[in-house]
């Protein structure tokens, strides 16, 4: 009989749930807001309620609960070690212990960007690759690094926090983490919107910017290319450290092949030494909203 796992993807505004089989297929899905009352209800309380409602009487026997979670996750203990977002009461939450006591099942917890990468490695655009840098572009920048077929986690499972290496340390923009010049302040889609508005463009969001760029607006294209260059410079440094086969771009903007992925690939190759460019691929993630669920389950399977 096929094994089934419960994947739980806890984000800043919603929790996604999915029954995932042993081949990485999502059999059933659900989603619930975690910010519906301004976080007055603790996030993990909302998650537990969502799980109980999701696991109906006819649900299959589960091997365990695999959690992908926003924030700096101590994956060794399954605890939230830190966060740069405005999530009241999230730091210090024992996700693993709480869910194991509540549901009587083994639980693993990993960072959401790491899970995105693992999902793509198991069942998506990075399948078959052993050395991959995964970057998720959104309101911030998340990242994961696969080297020699293994996820780079570090001593406490906190490794791969790509959004907070210092791209412009001396004269950069202040970051929510308290530092200056962090990568996500230049590479996130919010940075693109900020740059467009600073240039006097009508740019309420990233979608509007890409629509204007697709229409050939020269000022918008100049802002977009500047943003792509910032992303590329950060990736170039990572390429020289990790020598990946593949750079994987996730987030909603990754669907912009002609306006983002193709020019980004070209700019990265121009910014690195020739030996590192040989065979290097840059492509969009494939699993979209399922990546965190699938990757969390893959992480669970690896820990057993």
Where are these regions (language model features)?
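Short beta-strand segments
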Residues: 9, 66-70, 110, 134-140, ...
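Short, flexible active-site-adjacent loop segments at beta-strand->alpha-helix junctions, enriched
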Residues: 71-73, 86, 113, 157, ...
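Active-site nucleophile and cofactor-binding loops and adjacent substrate-binding regions
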Residues: 85-88, 108-114, 134-137, 283-289
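Glycine-rich phosphate-binding loop of actin/hexokinase-like ATP-binding domains
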Residues: 127-186
